[in-house]
Each structure stands twice: as C-alpha cells, then as structure tokens.
Regions:
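Flavin-dependent oxidoreductase catalytic cores
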Residues: 1-294, 298, 302-314, 322
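FAD-binding core/adjacent interface of flavoenzyme oxidoreductases
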Residues: 250-258, 353-363
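Beta1-alpha1 glycine-rich phosphate/pyrophosphate-binding loop at the start
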Residues: 293-360
Length: 363
C-alpha cells in the first residue's frame, strides 16, 4: 500500500471570499486570481496561524499518516507569499531581507516539529528558482535550504516558478522540457544532508531512474503521470516499463477540472474518477466473445485494448492505412508531438493483447 502524506497550508492571499466569508490574508496587499485583495496579516495573527499549523501537524500524526507536507513554493498561499519578494512588501521583521521573509515558514516548521515525534518526517516543497525578475533565485534557495533542514525538515521537494508569473514551471505542459527543475534540485542537494526530490514534468520512469542513479536527486515526485496510470509504481517495480501508460502532459482535464469542477478527469485515462463505476474492468470476462471495433483512432484502439485484455477476441477495421485517426492531425501542431507517445502505447498494448488490425477496410 501507499503512505499518506497530507500537505497542510494556509491559503493566505488565495483565500476565496465567498467561502464562509473568509477575507484573504497576506504578507502585503495582493490581488489573487479571483480578483480578491488580501489585507496584510498582523504579527499577532501570524503567531496564531503558526500555532494552528502545529495543531494541524499533531492531528496528521495522530491520524496515522506517514508524514507531513508543507508548501512554501510558487509565491503562492501564505507561506509562499511571505517567502517571495514578489508578494512580500512588509517593512517589519517578516519582510525585506531573505531572513525576514523566511521567518514565517521557519517558525511554522519549528512549531510543527515541536508537535511531532522526532522521527516523523516533514516534507517541504520549495521553488528552486521563481524564474521571474525580482523573485527568489537559486542562490536564495541555496542559502535557505540548510536553514530549512536545521529547523526540522526531513525532505525537500524542489519545484519552480510562480503561480501567476511562471506557471509553466509548476505544471510544464507538452512541448516543455522534461525535468525542468532537476538542475535546481541537484544544486540544492549539494548543500543539505537530507533527501532532495525533483518535481515538474517527470513523466518518464526511465528518465526518473536515470537522474536518481546519477545522483542528481534522491527521488522524484509525480502527480499527473499517476492519473494516466495509477499502477505506474507497481509496473515500474516489476520492470514492466513498456506497459506504463504515458502521461502526455497535456494539462487538460486534470488541471482545469481540479480547479473548476469537482471531478478530476484525464484525457489519457477515461477511468479517472470513475473507478468504482466499472469494477469489471481489469478483470477477465466471464465469457470470451468476438468483437469488431470500427476505427483505429484513440477511442477505438482503447476500446479494443480494454476488451482484448479482458480475454475477448478483437478485430479493428480501419478505413485508412495507419492508426491514429484525428490524433495524426493534432500532433502536427507545435509542441503537441508528445501525444504520439499515447498512440504508440495504444498500438503496443493492442498488439500485446492480440488485437487484429485490418487496414483500408470500411464497415
């Protein structure tokens, strides 16, 4: 099974006013994506929030979780906005210098550590570089990383960018470089004695294994690839790398749905959010049948693959001479070539399952 490590965070400037009438709080006056303006949090309120973090940490351990996650990346939410000079314009002990801007998150870390068992791990996500003029650079993180370790952090997750100015480093889409934050993570690893993980478009197990084996990082964090294939860790452990359904980093339904609608979806994996609706999938069919699928586009191939892997004898008729359907047009657009991985994977899985493909054949 998996270990649950919940990430606790005060939303700060990202608070939604319509939710229980909560007014956004921030280090300074800032406007969030909803147009709501935060008011500067007072020192007394800061001390209250720090205590609340400690109490929440205590509940995390009491609930039997395997660790505690904290977030101070992306100039985002309360800890991240305090740390970033892009958001923090205070003139008191919580603003100005890098030490003052880091004071809040360091107090949070120490308070959480005080409320946890000595060996209960604390994970901290940071931006290795905010990659924006006037934001925190790698040099600031190299200075702060040992301080985070000293305060009680057990593992650093290195992301990058900011929520508003450099989102592409947080959720790198197709067409963007794989492992965009690995360099920053590898540099931070040199100045601490705790594990350092890289975050951000690490959607290939072979690549992940390579950067770990070369000692660039101690591990990786994945999100979107586990939606495309929830069995990715098990398949990787078993050496079934070709069987892993590839994430195309399309940032489609997984990102937009999680922000706008309650149900997350995936363009690659149609079962995301519907796993309990189709309990028979993944299990052998009660009786093998002969099935004909019309069209070797992504939908037809996925249907054929699913049926064949359950034990049915499946044939695909495709009117053209190649697989792919409309996806062959889509991948011609700039930056969309990564979607070819999905098509190649479907072809591999169909062949492995024994699907017969007949080309230049109309129904």
């Amino acid at each position: 099974g998996s270990t649950l490590v919940p990430q606790i965070v005060h939303p700060g400037p990202e608070s939604i006013c319509g939710y229980r009438g909560i007014a956004p709080l921030g280090p300074s006056v800032n406007k969030n994506a909803n147009g709501h303006v935060s008011r500067p949090i007072s020192v007394e309120e800061i001390q209250t929030v720090v205590k609340q973090y400690g109490a929440a940490a205590r509940r995390v351990e009491a609930a039997g979780c395997g660790g505690l996650g904290l977030h101070t990346a992306h100039a985002y939410m309360l800890p991240g906005s305090f740390l970033s000079p892009l958001r923090n314009k205070r003139m008191d002990e919580y603003g100005g210098t890098i030490d003052n801007r880091a004071r809040f998150i360091l107090e949070v870390i120490r308070e959480c550590r005080k409320n946890l068992s000595p060996d209960f791990p604390i994970f901290l996500r940071v931006s290795g570089s905010e990659r924006v003029e006037g934001g925190n650079s790698l040099q600031e993180m190299l200075y702060l990383a040992p301080k985070f370790e000293e305060a009680g952090v057990s593992l650093l997750e290195v992301s990058g960018g900011t929520q508003y100015e450099a989102l592409e480093y947080i959720l790198p889409a197709h067409g963007k470089q794989i492992g965009m934050n690995v360099y920053e993570a590898s540099e931070i690893k040199k100045v601490v004695n705790i594990p350092v993980y890289a975050v951000g478009k690490i959607n290939d197990v072979r690549y992940a294994a390579d950067i770990v084996e070369r000692g660039l990082v101690d591990g990786v964090s994945m999100g979107r690839p586990l939606l495309a294939d929830p069995d990715l860790p098990n398949k990787a452990k078993a050496g079934l790398l070709d069987d892993i359904t590839p994430c195309g980093s399309c940032d489609g339904s997984c990102v937009t749905r999680s922000s706008e609608k309650p149900q997350c979806k995936c363009h690659i994996n149609p079962l995301v959010g519907k796993e309990y609706d189709y309990p028979e999938l993944g299990k052998p069919a009660a009786k093998s049948k002969k099935l004909l699928v019309i069209g070797a586009g992504p939908g037809g191939m996925y249907a054929a693959m699913t049926a064949a892997e359950r034990g049915h004898k499946v044939t695909i008729w495709e009117k053209d001479s190649i697989i792919g359907g409309q996806l062959n047009l889509a991948v011609r657009s700039p930056g969309k070539q990564e979607m070819c991985k999905w098509l190649m994977h479907l072809n591999y899985r169909c062949k492995k399952a024994g699907v017969e493909m007949v080309f230049n054949k109309e129904a």
